[in-house]
Amino acid sequence: GGAVPIVGAEIRILDPQGSSVYELTTDESGETERVSLETMDRSLSLDPDYSGTPYTGYDVLVRAAGFNSLYISGVPIYEDETAIQPAELLPMQQTQRSPMVNEITIEKPAAASDIRRIQEKPEPELRVLRQVVIPDPITVHLGSPSSSAANVQVRFTDYIKNVASSEIYPTWPDASLRANIYAIITFALNRVFTEWYRSRGYSFDITSSTAYDQAYVHGRTIFESISRIVDEIFNQYVRRQGQNAPYFTSFCNGTTATCSGLSQWGTVSLAERGLTPLQILRNYYPNNIEIAETNAVTGVLSSYPGTPLRTGSRGLDVQVIQTWLNRIRRNYPAIPEITDEAGVFGDSTRAAVTKFQSVFNLT
């Protein structure tokens, strides 16, 4: 079923020396208060020549009665950046005497590592979906394509936030973040559109392999600067003018690796020179690319909570619908604004749903 907030979970934050700096408890929403942590100077993460780690990594231990514990090592904290750490706890089995500890390790972003990229470009005549659709959820294989790793289903926006947080630094200038996020969204949509893996008999859309596709670390920290942009542009992608297909937006870090696609570090200096996200993208991809958007979503039914949403419903499923309706409102201003609290199905959400259903003849 859907996720339920865990009230009263204990969270301990440990500094790099292993000393406990905070002990927190989750509230009725399953969240803790925000806390401030010491870290490095922000400017270090804007310098491609800085060879150290431009952030301080903290460890987080999450415990709750009846659940297995979670230990996250290397949670990256940047100056003036809000880091959001999801924590999904798995219930203990009845046969278990004591909780196990599940571990997540967060490495430095791909832009700072020297992994060789071998992102393969699809041939134009591969199986292709006629319409550009957002796979929600997207199925991610947690390893290289032929490995026996697990597949996970992830909300598309959460997937993009995770990849961007795993690929680049959240401190980069806004235009640089946007250019990279457009490339990340488009790369994923290209894999789905060309059915790159599914046409080869695999049961997933994309892998978490930095070499073959783009970095994804299940359960990792995400950053508010990235999260905010993704919520705004997750249904926009790069294509050539006059073509529907998502362009093959390959990329690499541009320091230890160079490629024919976008240079992640290169976007920083271009943004600092005042270029817009589209100008930055045109610097690396053909000049006739444009940003398009799609309002087609597939797979929404598979994430259907099993009960109809109605006034008084609460939770992530409601929030998903509110996010979509607010996004669609930009193009369909007849849909009234949602003023309800996120995740709460109140009168304004009901009004927006009703109008959406009539606009799209769904009633």
Label each region the model flagged.
Residues 25-27, 51-55, 78-80:
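Surface-exposed coil/turn segments at beta-strand junctions on protein surfaces, enriched
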Residues 1-2, 44:
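Short amphipathic, basic-aromatic surface patches that mediate peripheral association
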Residues 2-28, 318:
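Short, ordered, surface-exposed loop/turn motifs in non-cytosolic proteins
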Residues 8-12, 35-37, 61-363:
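Conserved, single-site charged/polar hotspot
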Residues 4-6, 17-19, 53-55, 131-133, ...:
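Short, surface-exposed loop/turn motifs at beta-strand boundaries within globular domains
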Residues 19-46, 332-334:
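Short, acidic Ser/Thr/Gly-rich low-complexity loop/linker segments typical of extracellular
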Residues 1, 27-29, 342, 363:
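Acidic/polar residues in short coil/turn loops that connect beta-strands
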Residues 42-73:
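A short, solvent-exposed loop/turn motif at the edges and junctions
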